[in-house]
Amino acid sequence: MAFVLTFFPFLSFILSPIAIMVHEIGHTVVLWLFGYPAIPAFDFANGGGITMSDLERSPSAVWAWAIGLIALGWWRREHTGTLVGLGAAALAYFWMFNSTRETLAITLGGHAGEIAFGALFLYRGLTGWGCRIELERPLYAFLGFMILFGSMRLGLSLLGETMEKHWYLQGKGGIDNDLVTGAQILSWRLESAARALIFFTLLAIPASFVAASMRKHIGAVAEAEEDL
């Protein structure tokens, strides 16, 4: 059903607000990570969504992340793996901070958000983690597949000379679309960016199944499994 809704435009329009919002939440999260206050919203003027931000960095937000990272490191100080992960995250953050890499992360954060939410919803559908009633599981799985299929559909539409590609290249509100900007930053062709999107979207599906098979090790299981 998710496949049908994805590849039939009229039907995909019905649930498109969900994909739009998770896309904008992705941008919002990355903006906040780098200290830019932002709010996800629907764009009623030009269609789709928009992430509202004045792109003025807030030093207090950056310091809040730093303090949080230090506090988490202190709390988990006896777990070497956690400390290594936090150290790697801090190095990656400073490597990207206030650079073209930061701009790239913000630009592609929307598509990363779609893939992350799609994988998370699929994981919840497979495991029942966080579900109160059994009916939630197929709904989460449906939403996960719908978001991921939608991401793949966009990537596939940009590989050839399609009408969707023509409209995508027009941008929105005088601003280039995310993959166009990302390709320019990376000095890639748009088709290469589209292939990367397809690859990471496809990767999210088996990754969700692998994570589900390791759910007890991860610690994110359904309530019924918690006491087993």
In which residue ranges do the predicted regions lie?
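Aromatic-anchored segments of alpha-helical transmembrane domains
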Residues: 4, 88-97, 143-155
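Membrane-interface loop-to-helix entry segments
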Residues: 53-64, 104-119, 192-201
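Small-residue-rich helix-interface/hinge motifs
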Residues: 6-63
